[in-house]
Each structure stands twice: as C-alpha cells, then as structure tokens.
From Swiss-Prot:
Record-listed E.C. numbers: 6.1.1.14
BP terms from Gene Ontology: arginyl-tRNA aminoacylation; glycyl-tRNA aminoacylation
Name the record gives this protein: Glycine--tRNA ligase beta subunit
Pfam families in alphabetical order: DALR_1, tRNA_synt_2f
Keyword entries, A-Z: Aminoacyl-tRNA synthetase, ATP-binding, Cytoplasm, Ligase, Nucleotide-binding, Protein biosynthesis
Keyword Protein biosynthesis tagged: yes
Amino acid sequence: MADLLFEIGAEEIPAGFVPGALRQLEDDLSKALADARLAHGEVRSVGTPRRLAVWARDVAPKQTDARTEAFGPPVAQAYDAEGKPTPAATGFARSQGVEVSALVRAQTPKGERVAVTKVEKGRRAEQVLPALLERLVGGLRFRKAMRSRFDEATFARPVRWMVALLGGRPLKVRHGEVTSGKVTYGHRFLAPKAIALKGTPDDYLAKLRRAHVLADPVERRAALLAELARAGKEAAGKVRDDPALVEQVLYLVEEPTAVVGEFEKSNLELPPEVVISEMRNHQRYFAVVDGKGRLKNRFVAVSATRVKDPAVARHGYERVLRARLADARFFFEEDRKRRLHERIEDLGRRTFQAKLGSELDRAQRIGAVASALARALGKDALVADLLEASRLAKVDLNTGMVGEFPELQGTMGAHYARLEGLKPEIADAIEDHYKPIGAAEELPRSDLGALVAVADRLHSLVGIIGVGEKATGAADPFGLRRSAIGILRIVIARGYHLSLAAAVEQTLDALSGVKLAAGRAVVAEQVLDFLRGRVRAAWTERFDADLVEAVLAAGSDDVVDARRRLEALADAKARPDFGSLAVAFKRVANIQEKAGGSGAAAVDPALLRDAAEKDLLAALEKVEQEVVARRAARDYPAVLRTVATLEPAVARFFDGVLVMAEDPALRANRLGLMRRVAALFSDLADFRKIQAEAPAQARAG
C-alpha cells in the first residue's frame, strides 16, 4: 500500500472557486479510483488560493482483476444435432476474441445460452494513475476558466506546477505544458523556493507549514480565528461575528496575519450598515464592535503576507478605506437633501421590466396586492400603512447611496425614513420587505413588513410568468424560485391562512393593464403550479416524499394548513400502529374512487345486516362530531388520533362484509358507509399515496 498525493499549483484562484474545486477533487478521485478498481483508504482534499491538492491513503499496488461474462445465442441455436458449433456459435466466439472451445453453457432468465467468461488482469497502480489524474485535473469545472496560449488545456488560473507522487515515487502527469514532478513551492513572498516532497500527506502539510502555507483549510480557519481574536483585543473590542466573511478570507490567504486599522470617528455618524458594507463587501475588512455590539472606529484587515513594518500595511489599508468612506459620506449628505416622498415620481423613470413597466408601476401594484392580502386576513387596519410603505419601499433605488452600495437597498430607505420622522413601523417595513434574502435568512419583523414582502414577491412571480418569462433548469434570471420560497417562508412563519389561488387572482387584478402572454386562467395555473413545485421541493427535504404527496393531493391552497397536516401525519407515521391505519384508510379511499361519489353520505341503519357494519357505524357516530370540532380548530394530531380509533372496526368490516353486494340497496348503503369513513380523513391526506403496510402480525391475523 502507498499514499497517492496530487497537487495543482496555480496563480491565485478566486476565493469563491476554491471550496467547490476541493469538493470536486475529492469526489472525483474517490469515484475514479473505484472505477479503476484500485482499493484505497481515506481520500481528502486541501487547498489555498495557489494550490489545490488531494490525496488517497493506502492505494493498492495493482488493480483487482475484472471478471466479465458475455452471453451469446441459445444453446439450441449454437450447436447442431450432433453437438457441433453452428455459425451462430463461431460468430459469437469470434466477436468475443476467443476460440469456440472456450464457450460454456449458462442458465439465464431467457433460458440456457452459450457464454464466455473473460478475466482482465489488473495493471499496476503507477500504470493506471497518470491518465486517471490527467482526467481528474482536466475535468475540474469552474464558473470561468482560462485557456493556455499553446493548447486547449483550461483551468481557473494558469497552472504553474503539479506534484504527483505514489509512495514518494513521481508519476508523469501532464496538463497543458506543465508536467508533474515531486517539488512544490511555499509562500510566494516568505518562502518561494522549491520544496522536495516525500509523498505522504503528513510530510506535505508539515513542509508547507514551515514554508508559511497552511494548506489545510481546517487548520487555516483556526489560525484565522485566533488572529481575529487577538486583533480584536488589540483594538479594545472584538471582531464582529461574520462567518461568511471568514469563509471568504479563508481562501484569500495561505497564512493569515491580522492588521488592526483605524478610521475617523466622524464616520460613525453614517449608518453602521454603510460602514460595515464598505469594509466587508468592498475591502474584506472585519468590523470591530464594543461590548454592547456598537461599531467602533477600528477594523481588522487580514494580510496575505507578513511585513517588517506593520505600520506600512496598516496605513495602506486605512488610506483605501478613508477614501471609500469619504465617498459614502458625500452620497449620504446628498441623499438627505431630498425627502423620500419627493423621490416617488422618480421611480417612473426607472424600468422594472420592459413588459411590466416602471418601478412606480411596481410600487403601486405592490400596494394594491398588500392591501388585498390584509383584507383577506382580516387586517384592514393596516391598509393605510401598507399603501404608504409600498409607495416608499423602492424609493431608495434612486439614491446615490444605493447606487454605490446596491446591497443596502431597503436598509438606506429605512434609515432615511427614520431620519425624516416617519412612523417606525413604516421604516421597518421598507427595510424588511426584502427579507428573507436567502433560504436561512431572517424574516420580516411585523405584519406590515411581511405583507409588503409577500406582495412584492407575488407581483414579481405573477408578473414575470405572466409576460412569458420562466425559470428553466439552472437559469432563473428574475429570481422566481427565490421569490416563491420567500412567499412560502413568510406565510408559514406568520401563520397566514391565505388562499394561494385567491392571492394570485388578486395579483392578476393589480396587473390588469399588462398584456399577458397567455390567458388569465392559464397564467394563474402556471403560477400555482410553480408555487406547488417549490412547496414540494422544500418539504421533501425534511419529510418523507410520500407524505408530502399525500398531503398536497388533499389540498395545498392554504400552505399553513397543509404544513400542519403534514407535521401531524409525520408524527403519526412514527407510531407502530400507523401501518395498519394507513392500509385500512387506503382501502377505503380506493373503494370510494372506484365506486364514484365523495363526501359524507346517509346510511340507513335498517339495511345493515352484518355485525361488523353495525359496529363500524356505531364507532363512526361516536367520533364524527369530535373529528369535525378538532378539524375546525386545525388540531390535526387530535384528528388523526381520533380517526385512528376506527381502524379496528374498519379492519373487521373488510374482513367480514362484501361492500359490492349484488343487492343494489345493500351495496349503496355500504358505499355510503365508506364515504362516511372517508369524509373523516380525505381532506387531511390522500392515504393512497402513502407507502405503508400493516405489521406482520396484523396481516397474519
């Protein structure tokens, strides 16, 4: 057994490319070794902006032999009456590269056939690995790649060296004009000389560590966090928590060195989000806060190298930030010269989407939709504020500050609203209507912000789909999936019992002046189908797919209600008696579907002949009122517990009663009894879609 080590050295790879490339290297090498029939131990990747490396421990010295079996014609066609090979047999043997005498008889599902077994002897690992590694590096995919001037080889950035070692012995691997060897290189400035490697992962990491390169991202992250903690204390505060920035900076440096800098206190008069955005998004600096979380006029930059005089680096970082903050102050002061209400008409000169009109059109429609949603929820008192918040929600798009810092849309509008003395709730709604930005981001804080946020997303979703634009595959230029997920997250989190169909219709009303690419009913169904797809995708990440399908089939117009039904059903499925219950109710639903008809039905007690059907009716009458009451209260766990008490009576009914009796009156009465049972659970879930079976003892009984 020997360790395989493979490193690709390159010019600085963009930080966002590195984590994905490392995952791909690890996954692809594992699969390639398996496909090559080379046994191995741990596969792991490490990397920095200048190198991507992967290793496999304990690689077998040679491939395992491959045994393959090929089947030919039936024996009856392969040999004549005297047992001599026919042309069919000789032709098959020739196609397999063997003598006809090598053919054997083999039983197959299609009868006895001639066959040939071939064994491919495994080659030595050093013979297999060079081509395997060339495919590995050539198969790496990046959002953008560069091509060499001299050949077709591509990579994120120009490849400068490669290392390929098996048990310390070099393998010859080529990528473009670069051929692998056994030397790597340390830090570009602190240890640029070549470093000879022994080929083990431990030797690789240790030698690079001495050369000022922490190749392992886990080790480098720990060093980065330690540097940030040290620098925070030096700055008489602490570095503001920012996991996303830590992850980004992690792949910008090979050995992190923190530098504390300072900016003028007067810049703290700017909204803190402006200062933080300038530091983190434009300069990759970490903000420093005091014990109460308030921004200090200090920052921490992470240098990719160590310098003899830290003051030189500090002054450089401060100079860049000083200029950027001066620009921010200028935009802030200029923006304050006009009130938000004075900017509303400016939205008419800003296009939202060519077929959907201006941002002013958009703002007016958002207000109409938000008001309709509020009335549907019985929140009429919010309508005036909703209209005001909707008018102002997009106004900051025309400010200088948002023009310079697009990531602060909504945030700056909220700041300006507060400075102008507008209602705090309206200011919060202006900021919150962009939330959630991502799948795990925070949600709007109030009904006001939540309803404007939902209305904004509904307008985008219905409008964009309505004019014929759709999300296809990986392409979603208008963020339709994000809009749909945002709607669902807000509605469920706030417990809004909204009809999605009605909400879509209300949005189409607001879009009445827009020319739709299809009929109104067609557009409405396209939007609802898109929303249902997002519901299905989101819920199947957490719940069993069959339960999700069962619940959605019973109704998904009110997603809050559907989610509660799903959670109750998932809890019920975890109980040992669920299999029997699901099987019984599935049978009830199947009978009802075949017989036609739905809903509750009258049952004539006088036509009940068997004890089992009389018992079932008695059991039904005991629970029907309770189920109706529990269902009205949306207490679905209680509904399922109550309905579950019917399972023994339903099982006995099916064991002893013929539902489809020859007597039409008996048959109709028994089908009515089935409809009465189905009426108790059919609006909870379609049990026919649930994958379940009764316990073995129940089936045996």
